[in-house]
Amino acid sequence: MPVLHNRISNDELKAKMLAESEPRTTISFYKYFTIASPQQTRDALYQVFTALDVFGRVYLAHEGINAQISVPQSKLETFRQQLYTFDPALDGLRLNIALEDDGKSFWVLRMKVRDRIVADGIDDPTFDASNVGDYLKAADVNAMLDDPDAVFIDMRNHYEYEVGHFENALEIPADTFREQLPKAVEMLREHADKKIVMYCTGGIRCEKASAWMKHNGFNKVWHIEGGIIEYARRAREQGLPVRFIGKNFVFDERMGERISDEVIAHCHQCGAPCDSHTNCKNDGCHLLFIQCPQCASKFNGCCSEQCCEELALPEEEQRRRRAGRENGNKIFNKSRGRLNSKLSIPDPAE
């Protein structure tokens, strides 16, 4: 029986990826469709992807598939053909190609079965996720941005919005997508007669959000086809003005793709213009925050003097302090509340 999971250490896999000479292409895709047996589908797809040396993160559920991966360029067409023939629902699926890509976005393939491909918190049995808003292509997006009757809604997290967004887009202040959905309905009640345009990174969140808005009585709802990634690519190809300002945050080693030259965010430590995210180098913290090169040098890649001091301790002492620590379960926490408490950043919602 073939091995259907990774057995090599992360450090070894990352070193192997960094030593690769063959270029890779970073791709994201999703599809809402019914998967009768997610585990069986996962196991079959895992064998297809490993045979093609695909790295990345793939989630499957009864409601569909969500993937962010990298593929060796020499195997890209074979990958496309095998994906399209794997299931009729995937035939011709749009693949979002990364806008800025050094091919070093992933170093291991992780494929998991989940309850949902996007954690939405929806338990309403009458909700029809297929009743989505209409797609908008790049030219349509620009036209809507000039329409005074249109309202753009950013369905991404606070740390994504902070470094880049469409002109005058509304942020839904929440730490998770499941928190955003009811807040979006509440915030947009006063705009119920407007044209609601929803967007996210690659389309998966705003597609479901558009269906949720329609479920809650909003009739004029659109969402951007392929999200920010597809919009920027098509706008550039068609010679259209790119109306997204700043950087597009991505969930891999790159942590962002430059869309425009503007830097609209600031270093969370000194306030200098900066839009480069990093994780605190103290493994007992690992806070996601924005740090300029000067502060990275001053704090040794840490978010605070406390973390800097802890990082300087012997490794054994660091492990002892991490063991059983109250906030040990906050590793990888990206919440606005934790960011504000550690770095004294004012909450824009207050």
Curated annotation (Swiss-Prot):
Signal peptide: none
Reaction(s) catalysed by this chain's protein: uridine(34) in tRNA + AH2 + O2 = 5-hydroxyuridine(34) in tRNA + A + H2O
Active site positions, chain numbering: 200
Superkingdom: Bacteria
UniProt cross-references to Pfam families, sorted A to Z: Rhodanese, Rhodanese_C, UPF0176_N
Biased segments, Basic and acidic residues type: 319-328
Alphabetical list of Gene3D superfamilies matching this protein: 3.30.70.100, Rhodanese-like domain
Domain Rhodanese stretches: 146-240
Region called Disordered, residue ranges: 319-350
Enzyme Commission number(s) from the entry: 1.14.-.-
GO biological-process terms attached to the record: tRNA modification
Cross-referenced CDD domains: RHOD_YceA
GO molecular function, one term: oxidoreductase activity, acting on paired donors, with incorporation or reduction of molecular oxygen
Record bears the keyword Oxidoreductase: yes
Keywords: Oxidoreductase, tRNA processing
General function of this protein: Catalyzes oxygen-dependent 5-hydroxyuridine (ho5U) modification at position 34 in tRNAs.
UniProt-listed NCBIfam families: PRK00142.1-1
Homology family: Belongs to the TrhO family.
Name the record gives this protein: tRNA uridine(34) hydroxylase
Gene name, Swiss-Prot/TrEMBL: trhO
